Amino acid sequence: MITLIAAISTNNALGKDNDLIWRLPADLKRFKKVTSGHHILMGRNTFESIGKPLPNRTSVIITRNNNYKKEGCLIAYSLEEAIAFTEGKDAFIIGGAQVYKQALENNLIDQLDITRVHQEFEADVFFPEIDSTVWKEIYREDFLADEKNVYDYSFISYQKI
C-alpha cells in the first residue's frame, strides 16, 4: 500500500521557506511510528530540509538532477520509479508539495494519513484540496492543545473510494 502522509493546516498550508511552519511533537512521534521500517519517498527539497536519511527507513529521493547522489539513500528520477523501489511493500510519500500533487493527480496512492493542525498559517506551499468524491474518511482522532502541542490537531486517515 502506498500512503501519502502529511501535516497540513486549516488553510492547507504545508510549509514556508522549505521548512515546517509549526512544531507539533505528537505529529512527529506518530510520523516516526508509522513510517519506521518502511520506504519513505520524497522530493529533493524535502530531503534537503531533513538533512539526512531517517533511521530505520529506506529513503528514496526523487530528483530531476541525474548527478544527484546522497549516501544512504536511493535516487529516483520520477515518482513512478520511486514507487518501483518499494517492490510492492508498504511505503509512505512524505512530500513535498509537488510530489503530493503528482501522486494525487496520477492516482498513485491508496491512503492519506493527514495530521490536520486546526490553525491557519501563512505559507508558500499548500496541500491540494482533498476530494470527497475520491477519498472517504475512515479514521479520526481529535486532540486539544496541551503543554507540548500548542495547537489543536486531528489525525485523519482517508481511503480511496
Regions found by a protein language model. Give the residues of each.
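Enzymes that bind and transform nitrogen-containing heteroaromatic metabolites
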Residues: 1-161
